[in-house]
């Protein structure tokens, strides 16, 4: 029995995806998660054969969730399900080892075809995007490894730095001491191999 995890914070879309997959691939066992923490918990405690991941859900509003999961579960087949048509972003998604990109506008048959192809070990992209997406984005792949080493708390601090907040403001938003924020910033700089906030902002901007 093949078990698939749908990770998306929109219950209506999860229901629609579940319905489409149940009709086309009735042998699948389907699990659901609505945020990054729940997704990681399920992956830690259950045998999942394929993860269908939305990039934008609580715990991750950009590529961090994908990078975090790829770091924790490097052997897990992952496909991103998203409404974006940004080929640069899709190229980044594929470059970090993701096996597929499924548009949220895809038909039930296309979704089933994608799942079957990915379970067979193939990379699946929609026909209209396959020629435009550069699968070998080595520069971003190297950056992704560094970003994936951040903890979720460090990632939140990095996002606030990207938004231009000072340490005191970040501490207020996260309800932590300013000294703790400074410790996170130091760790972020070390893990990313940088030495100032401007460089951190440039890196964070590439995750959007």
Specify the residue positions occupied by each region the protein language model found.
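Helix-turn-helix DNA-binding segment
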Residues: 141-178
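Basic, Lys/Arg-enriched C-terminal extension of HTH/homeodomain DNA-binding domains
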Residues: 186-208
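Active-site residues of response regulator receiver
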Residues: 54-55, 82
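Short amphipathic alpha-helix used as the core "switch/output" element in two-component signaling
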Residues: 63-75
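Acidic, metal-coordinating helix/loop segments flanking the phosphotransfer/catalytic sites
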Residues: 32-50, 64
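Conserved active-site segment of CheY-like receiver
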Residues: 9, 81-85, 104-106
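Short, flexible helix-to-coil linker/hinge segments that flank and couple to helix-turn-helix
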Residues: 90-94, 100-147
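The feature encodes the CheY-like receiver
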Residues: 58-61
